[in-house]
Amino acid sequence: MSYIPFPDISPELFSIELFGVTFALRWYALAYIAGLLIGWRLVLRMIRAERLWSFGPPMTEDQLERLLTWVILGVILGGRLGFVLFYQPAHYLAHPLDILKVWEGGMSFHGGFLGVMTALVAFCLKERISILPVADLLAAATPPGLFLGRIANFINAELWGRPTTLPWGVAFPGEAAQSCPGIEGICARHPSQIYEAGLEGI
């Protein structure tokens, strides 16, 4: 059976130790940062494009700057709480302080989405601006972040797909990825992160 070996890529770009605590910059964190910055620039360009708006853009550039802060909080808090509630509630109920250990990983796309939607609605109500046009702007600016996030999922060797005998199947590392009932030897799986990066992010 032909397959693609998983590339030797570290999930960490680099790490430093300060006062006995190791801080690492991971590809996943970089994907979040780059996705938010690219999305912000895209929305800014759309706001400035007068031809897009018959009656003016739905918010000002100053409001966009404030919205970015709300979105960042929504992504981080929603993503983390979503992971806690959806994937390991028993562990975090027994060890609640572990919720704060974001450097150990654990974010949820669904939680991040709900966090951003909550932040969007709260911000628009506070600023007295229409929710739907602002939601349209965010939706148009989201694909680059999704693309980068899925590429980071691939680098982390997580969220892989079903076993496959197709030649582009990837032999992901780890006991869970290699646990394929009925398959002896190397188990190749669909690189679903790459599929999703292309379908969601381009």
Swiss-Prot record:
Annotated TM spans: 18-38, 67-87, 105-125, 129-149, 166-186
Any one GO cellular component localisation term in the record: plasma membrane
* Family the UniProt entry places it in: Belongs to the Lgt family.
Q: How does it sit in the membrane?
A: Multi-pass membrane protein
UniProt GO MF annotations: phosphatidylglycerol-prolipoprotein diacylglyceryl transferase activity
Give the protein's biological function. Catalyzes the transfer of the diacylglyceryl group from phosphatidylglycerol to the sulfhydryl group of the N-terminal cysteine of a prolipoprotein, the first step in the formation of mature lipoproteins.
The record's section on InterPro entries has:
Lgt
UniProt-annotated location(s): Cell inner membrane
Its name, as the record gives it, is Phosphatidylglycerol--prolipoprotein diacylglyceryl transferase
Q: Which UniProt keywords apply?
A: Cell inner membrane, Cell membrane, Membrane, Transferase, Transmembrane, Transmembrane helix
Q: Name one GO biological process term.
A: lipoprotein biosynthetic process
The pathway that the record names for this protein is: Protein modification; lipoprotein biosynthesis (diacylglyceryl transfer)
- Tell me its EC number(s), please: 2.5.1.145
